[in-house]
Amino acid sequence: MATTSKILFRGAASTSSTLLYTVPASTTTVVTDIVITNTAASSATYELLLNDIVLAKTVTVGANDSTIIQLKQPLTATQTVKGLASAVTVNFHISGVEIA
C-alpha cells in the first residue's frame, strides 16, 4: 500500500456548502490538519462536514486570525469533506494522508 502525504484542499471558502475533497476510489484518506484563516478586519464563521456529519457548526474565527484543528479522521473511498463560511475572506487548508 502506498502512503502519500497530501494537501487535500487549499483555497477560499464559499458562502454556500461546497465540496472541498472526495476520497478517490480504492483509497482511504486520513485527514490530519485543518487550518482556517480569516483575512478580514471583522470576524467570520465557518462550518465543516466530514461525510455529511458536522465537525464544526457556525464557529467564529476572529478578524485576521486562524484556527487549527488537528485530528486523525479516516475517510473511505467516495466520502467527502465539505465546508462553507460567512465570508469569502475565510480560507481552508486541509492536509492528510492518502493510503491506496
Predicted regions and their residues:
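C-terminal interaction-tip segments
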Residues: M1-T29, D33, A85-A100
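Solvent-exposed, conformationally flexible loop/turn segments
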Residues: S14-T18, G62-T67
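Solvent-exposed residues in well-ordered beta-strands and their adjoining turns
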Residues: T37, N51, P74-T76, V97
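Short, surface-exposed beta-strand/strand-loop-strand elements in extracellular ectodomains
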Residues: A40-V59
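Beta-sandwich interaction modules
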Residues: D65-T78
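Cysteine-clustered segments with highest specificity for TGF-beta superfamily mature ligands
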Residues: Q79-G83
